[in-house]
Structures are given as structure tokens and as C-alpha cells.
Amino acid sequence: IEPFHSPDGDISCTFMNKDLLQTDYYWGEDFGAVSLWLKNGSRMWFILPDEGYTTADVLADGEYMQMVLQQEWENEKWMKVNLSVPKFDVNSTINLKDGFEKMGVTDVFTEGTANFSEITADMPIFLTAANQSVRVQIDEEGVKAAAYIEFPGAGSPAPPEEIIDFILDRPFIFAITTANIPLFIGTVNNP
């Protein structure tokens, strides 16, 4: 059990450690990052703001997203990484109705106007809400995201020479991508 420096003060949590992980280390103007390949070919990204920056700073800047979306990144180096990740379980429920309405999708929420006749002809129906719930959990057994479970895999070219410590002991951003398309993006402020 080690301290995690949350915005509300230090908390004790269990960290998972992987020493001398051979992987690419990425960096941007205000962050460092590593990614792990998951069993299905997806990637789990860990993006740590540099000292003096917050997750909000990195999210607002958007450079991290350019890195996640690209196959090659100019600030990338094959290294040995001592990775330390806290176990975490984050979930979120988002009301999508407001977003749909702002995009002009309103009829489906209006009684008498919604047309779901292809689904049911017996009675007129309409939607009263649209919500998305997401849960991402990471522990020694792997990554669970939404309704599927994936486990880290490994492959490696020639061993790197440089070694760095990448310790996620303060708020960080995570992302799960498939074919460079983000499936989940979140922040961990309190594992």
C-alpha cells in the first residue's frame, strides 16, 4: 500500500508494479505516457501530467488526444519502464438526452411525435431519457471495461537501454483505444 496524492489529500491504495516493462514511452508538452497492449489488440493508455500540471490542463490542451489517435508519435522512445499503477474502479453515467436535443434529435422524446412503428405497432411509444453508463476497472487480473474483459499481452523487439520510472501516484488520465479510436477516456483522481 502506497500513497496516492489526490486533489483532496493523500490516500492509501494498492499499486500494481511491473518492473523493466519494455514499451514505448511517449511525451508531450505537459505529460508523459505509456500504453499496454490488451489481448484483443486494444491499448490501455496511461497519461500522467507533468509536475505543475493537472489532468484538466492536459485534457484542455488536447495534445494527448493527437498522440492517442496517431500510429506514430514524434516524441516516442522504446524504453524499459518501471510501471506502477494503482488499482482503480471508475464509473460514470451520462445523460445523453440533452446532447441529442442540442443536435436536433427531439421527436423521439415527444409523445405523439416519436415514430417507433417498426418496433411496435400495438402502442405508440417514446423515449423519456437516454443515458450511457460506463465502468472501467483495473486490477491484477486485467482490465474490465463495460461488458468485456481483456488481459495485457506482450511482445518485444530488441531490449531498450534506458530505464524510467512511471509512477501513477497522482491524478492521471487513462484511455482504451482500438485501431486508434478511443473507446473509453477517463481520469483517476481518487483510486
Could you say what each language-model-derived stretch is?
Residues I1-P191:
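Hydrophobic-core positions in well-structured secondary-structure elements of globular domains
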